[in-house]
């Protein structure tokens, strides 16, 4: 992930993996609305609905814990996805994790912070970043939690065939403020730098003894 700098000499951020999320379904449309005022009220209502759904998902995420009987529950990660093709959108768990981290950092209730969201105030990120899905064909190897180099398996066997492992990587942008310093930091008093940090995700790998298993690796 791309480190978001602050007016201090060093900042360390470590992400946390998510385990599971419930289903998501929304109802309602704008076809029955009439007039600009009704449309505005309708759009506001839909926005509140989506925010309410996010709040419910985050509440559910606090409750859900992997049971001993469900040994696969801890194999889910916010930055890893098994799919037959390249995912078209960022992982939902990752978006929920980012939103939750923002709320936690604010140390305020969701409903209070909802109306002071940076996106609503037109704020810019301290560091620009880019995110993309990559496969094991591009990663080849990685380092696990014990410091050993393991081979990242490109395909994962499933009952009806094989699925590819995709990793959602976020890096600091090579353009803009990555080299010039962080946005919003007074250069007269502070030295700042945007740099890409690593986080652990769980992936299917093989060690040097040909043992295949799910391990935490750095991406």
UniProtKB/Swiss-Prot annotation:
Source organism superkingdom: Eukaryota
Keyword field: Cleavage on pair of basic residues, Disulfide bond, Glycoprotein, Growth factor, Secreted, Signal
SUPFAM superfamilies: Cystine-knot cytokines (SSF57501)
Glycosylation sites: 107
Family annotation (InterPro entries): Brain-der_neurotrophic_factor, Cystine-knot_cytokine, Nerve_growth_factor-like, Nerve_growth_factor-rel, Nerve_growth_factor_CS
Protein name per its UniProtKB record: Neurotrophic factor BDNF precursor form
UniProt similarity note: Belongs to the NGF-beta family.
Keyword Disulfide bond in annotation: yes
Signal peptide annotation: 1-5
Role this protein plays: Promotes the survival of neuronal populations that are all located either in the central nervous system or directly connected to it.
GO process terms (BP): cell surface receptor protein tyrosine kinase signaling pathway; modulation of chemical synaptic transmission; negative regulation of neuron apoptotic process; nerve development; nerve growth factor signaling pathway; neuron projection morphogenesis
Disulfide linkage: 127-194
GO MF: growth factor activity; nerve growth factor receptor binding
Predominant localisation class: secreted
Coiled coil: none
Chain residues in the propeptide: 6-114
PANTHER family hit by this protein: BRAIN-DERIVED NEUROTROPHIC FACTOR, NERVE GROWTH FACTOR NGF -RELATED
A single cellular component GO annotation: synaptic vesicle
Subcellular location: Secreted
């Amino acid at each position: 992930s791309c480190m978001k700098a602050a007016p201090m000499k060093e900042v360390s951020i470590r992400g946390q993996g998510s385990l599971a999320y419930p289903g998501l379904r929304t109802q309602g449309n704008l076809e029955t609305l009439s007039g600009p005022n009704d449309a505005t009220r309708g759009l506001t209502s839909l926005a509140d609905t989506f925010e309410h759904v996010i709040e419910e998902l985050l509440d559910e995420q606090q409750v859900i814990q992997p049971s001993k009987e469900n040994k696969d529950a801890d194999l889910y990660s916010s930055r890893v996805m098994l799919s037959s093709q390249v995912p078209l959108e960022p992982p939902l768990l990752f978006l929920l994790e980012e939103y939750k981290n923002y709320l936690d950092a604010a140390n305020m209730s969701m409903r209070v912070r909802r109306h002071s969201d940076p996106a609503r105030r037109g704020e810019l990120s301290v560091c620009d970043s880019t995110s993309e899905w990559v496969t094991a064909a591009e990663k080849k190897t990685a380092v696990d939690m014990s410091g050993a180099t393991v081979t990242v398996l490109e395909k994962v066997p499933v009952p009806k065939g094989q699925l590819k492992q995709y990793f959602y990587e976020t890096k600091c942008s090579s353009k803009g403020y990555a080299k010039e310093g962080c946005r919003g930091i007074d250069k007269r008093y502070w030295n700042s730098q945007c740099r890409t940090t690593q986080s652990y995700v769980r992936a299917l790998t093989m060690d040097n003894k040909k043992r295949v298993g799910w391990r935490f690796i750095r991406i």
